[in-house]
A protein has these predicted regions:
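Helical "lid/coupling" subdomains associated with nucleotide-phosphate turnover
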Residues: 7-12, 18-43, 53-188
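Two-metal-ion RNase H-like nuclease active-site motif
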Residues: 1
Length: 189
């Protein structure tokens, strides 16, 4: 669940069997916060992220007036959009899986950290809540960061996966010159 899209992969026996995308994700929530609290996009992002802690959130609106609100107020504001997002994601998952639900769902990305997201998705998929899990640290066990303050959470799972995929596949290509043009080709030995 990224900023602009929610991307979905359905797997079976360790392979991706279907892939889809819906244009609903975290930015929908951020834009709602922008409009409701009269803040800029960056402040709205900070409010959205801070709301995941369940504590008081302090911010300044566009008039530079300081406000403090409970995270629960943000949860109530974004709940209808979170409901819309999880409904669309569940429908797409079922569509990609031949019209039926899946056995389990792993959620990555910042949008999945939103209060109530995994619970709503589980409900719409007809799964027990423990079968819809937000993934983070447990899938990054083999990744070591030089900076000790980097938190292994759902926000970085996809970027790390892209980097590891590139690293694994970088030796699968060779560069050849054909008629004076450099071309990248797959090397299948």
């Amino acid at each position: 669940v990224g900023a602009g899209t929610s991307d979905i992969s359905v797997t079976k026996d360790g392979s991706i069997i279907a892939y889809g995308m819906i244009p609903l994700a975290g930015d929908e929530l951020t834009e709602l916060i922008v409009q409701h609290y009269l803040v800029d996009f960056q402040t709205a992002e900070r409010i959205k992220l801070a709301s995941t802690t369940g504590e008081m959130i302090t911010y300044k609106d566009i008039m530079m007036i300081e406000h403090s609100i409970p995270a629960k107020e943000v949860w109530e504001l974004i709940e209808p959009v979170t409901d819309k997002m999880t409904t669309a994601v569940a429908e797409k998952i079922k569509e990609l899986n031949g019209g039926q639900t899946v056995s389990a769902t792993f959620v990555v990305g910042g949008g999945g950290k939103i209060h109530g997201y995994t619970e709503m998705l589980a409900d719409k998929l007809g799964l027990p809540q423990e079968r819809v899990a937000l993934r983070g640290e447990e899938v990054l066990q083999e990744v070591t960061f030089e900076q000790p303050d980097i938190e292994k959470d759902p926000l970085i799972v996809t970027p790390i996966g892209i980097c590891l995929n590139y690293y694994d596949q970088k030796n699968s290509f060779i560069m050849v010159h054909l008629n004076g043009e450099r071309i990248k080709m797959y090397d299948n030995n």
